[in-house]
Amino acid sequence: MSRLVVDVTGRGEPLVLVHGLATTGAIWRRVTPSLARSRSVASIDVPGFGGSDPAGRGFDLDAVAQRIREGLARAGVAEPYDLVGHSMGGALALTLAAAHPEAVRGLVLVSPAGLAPVPGALAAAVGRAAELYIPLRRYGAPLAGHPWGRRLLMTGGVIDGAALAPAEVRQLVCSSRGARRTREALVAVAAADLRAMLAELQRPVGAIIGSGDRVVRPGTLDTIRALRPDAACEAVADAGHISMIERPRRFVTALERVLVAIS
């Protein structure tokens, strides 16, 4: 039986958190304590990342989403749950919700991938570039002690990496060592077009994006609103792509607002 790491804390209605590329469920650690005051919060390591076994060869969104649902069930996470997905995790969360709407009460997309597809050749090129960048990030932990090093290591993730604590950046970088399916996942989500899936989803939808996000396209919130006029949308001020790390309090406030709006 394949292993899915599921870390559950708190009591209340179930809330599932799905992380993005090149990291693990630890990406949520700055917001989990606040969320767990009123919720049972389950953060996972996506199959092929952290301590979770891959879902077969490569990275198939449907297969990975299915493995996530099965692993949550084995861990005793009750359905239906509110499902939150960040970046790659947004594409996976949407895929899971579309395949198994009975398992999901509401869906929250945080700076989601899968809504602005790129051509397959470009996606493959991005994947090859990741093969160079990810090792640098994995073994660049000593650079976190310098402001310029934190900026380099967190390029694209936050507005100013130097503003993060060295220990925070070091932990994020080290978590990349367990991201075994990063290249395959990057190619899969870059080429994915899940817009029709989102438009047709028979579940309430919310979205959160950092005001300074440089990874997802600037018009992503507009795209979501066009596809889902009923979506509850929030922007996290002064935050980039990893808003839950850069502005944890603001992120929690935004997420709680969205969850109330879609409940």
Task: Name what the model sees in each region.
Residues 201, 207-209:
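Short beta-strand/loop motif that positions the catalytic acidic residue
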Residues 85, 89, 93:
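Gly/Ala-rich beta-loop-alpha elbow adjacent to hydrolase catalytic centers
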Residues 239-252:
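Catalytic histidine-centered segment of alpha/beta-hydrolase-like enzymes
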Residues 141-200:
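Conserved alpha/beta-hydrolase catalytic His-Asp/Glu region
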Residues 9, 33, 42-85, 98, ...:
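Active-site loop/oxyanion-hole signature of alpha/beta-hydrolase fold enzymes
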Residues 98, 105-138:
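Flexible "cap/lid" loop of the alpha/beta hydrolase fold
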Residues 4-54:
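Conserved HGGG/HGGXW glycine-rich cap/lid loop of the alpha/beta-hydrolase fold
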Residues 212-216:
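Acidic catalytic loop of the alpha/beta-hydrolase fold
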